[in-house]
Regions:
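Extended, helix-rich architectural segments
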Residues: 1-135
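Extended, regular secondary-structure scaffolds
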Residues: 109-111, 121-223
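Extended hydrophobic/Leu-rich segments
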Residues: 11-14, 21, 25, 39-42, ...
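Solvent-exposed, flexible loop/coil residues
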Residues: 102, 107, 121, 142-148, ...
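Short stretches within intrinsically disordered, low-complexity N-terminal or propeptide regions
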Residues: 49, 76, 160, 179, ...
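Extended, charged amphipathic alpha-helical segments
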Residues: 201-320
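Short, well-ordered loop/turn elements at secondary-structure boundaries
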Residues: 116-119, 153-156, 251, 284
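N-terminal start-of-domain structural block
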Residues: 1-36, 188-222, 236
Length: 320
């Protein structure tokens, strides 16, 4: 898991530099490509769909979505029941505040993100003009936490960003980045450029007293629940796809005739070569007459169904 760091001695929450934030965003985009692969697998966009074969060869691409099964099951066990809070003191006001903040929904989203990405981010804020807090899950594809470079790895600030949509492609890429420090919130408009950019946006105090984003890890290394099983998932998809391919190849087997020509004495079968006419007649009549010293058989690929089934079950067991 990549950890974003910033020199502690250079950090000033009242002097956030756009060039630094842009550099961090570009690094996160690289990290996010690996995270996106995990979401692709969860959604069924898996490697088997990119497989290519020679023209004419069966190329079924079956996705047996074990990734989704694993994450949905793990999330149900982990956060299927809402989180409960107990205290010797009266915390009814706190529970009411958490309910109003949408904590249960955020917990569910966080649990699924932890299972898929190995990471989750939760943003706590007050809506404009209101005092009640709101909990919102932020996508790890567009969110990261930055720590200082000390041994304690203290949280300095969190960044949530997105690319400003411009379908004309006539202007340089721009990012809208929300930077959340211990005391302030910045909303920065950053151009994807090597030119220096001055931070003209004024920070707004958020009154939380700490970075209002919680960063969670599924485990110490931030590994998702099915991440290490991806090679096995690919192997399972390949086996199931090849199984269907072999069945199709069996149906499309080549007819081999020894000691005779299929096109002998074929007439009135329309256009085409003698062999093509013979094949039309054979398909229609389902009957083949051959001399005594000749024979016919289908050339088929030997398919060890029992062996493949044993391998399939072994891989499936390893996945789970």
């Amino acid at each position: 898991m990549f950890v974003f760091t910033y020199p502690a001695e250079k950090y000033d929450e009242l002097n956030i530099r756009k060039t630094d934030i842009l550099h961090l965003i570009n690094k996160h985009i690289t990290v996010a490509s690996a995270l996106k692969k995990k979401m692709d697998y969860y959604e069924g966009e898996q490697a088997i769909l990119e497989r290519k074969k020679e023209d004419g060869a069966p190329n079924n691409k079956l996705v047996c979505n074990h990734a989704k099964d694993i994450s949905d099951t793990a999330t149900s066990y982990f956060i299927g029941e809402p989180v409960t809070y107990k205290s010797d003191d009266d915390i009814s006001d706190l529970l009411k505040a958490l309910e109003n903040a949408g904590a249960d929904e955020a917990d569910g989203d966080n649990g699924l993100d932890l299972s898929i990405y190995g990471l989750a981010f939760e943003y706590m804020y007050a809506k404009e003009g209101q005092t009640e807090l709101v909990c919102k899950n932020l996508s790890p594809l567009r969110t990261f936490m930055v720590y200082d470079d000390t041994i304690e790895q203290n949280e300095l600030f969190a960044v949530y960003y997105y690319r400003k949509k411009d379908d004309t492609d006539t202007y340089p890429t721009q990012y809208i980045a929300t930077v959340l420090t211990q005391n302030y919130k910045y909303v920065l408009n950053i151009q994807d450029s090597n030119e220096p950019q001055e931070t003209t946006e004024e920070p707004q105090p958020h009154y939380m007293g700490e970075v209002p984003v919680n960063a969670y890890q599924n485990n110490k290394l931030g590994i998702g629940d099915f991440e290490l099983q991806i090679p096995l998932i690919d192997a399972y998809n390949a086996i199931m796809s090849d199984r269907v391919n072999d069945k199709e190849q069996f149906v499309d087997s080549i007819l081999a005739i020894y000691g005779a020509l299929l096109s002998d004495e074929i007439e009135d079968e329309g256009e085409g070569t003698g062999t093509q006419k013979a094949m039309k007649k054979l398909k229609r009549e389902k009957l083949l007459e051959l001399p005594d010293d000749s024979k016919a058989e289908y050339l088929t690929h030997t398919f060890d169904e029992a062996g493949v089934e044993i391998l399939r079950k072994a891989i499936e067991q390893d996945i789970h």
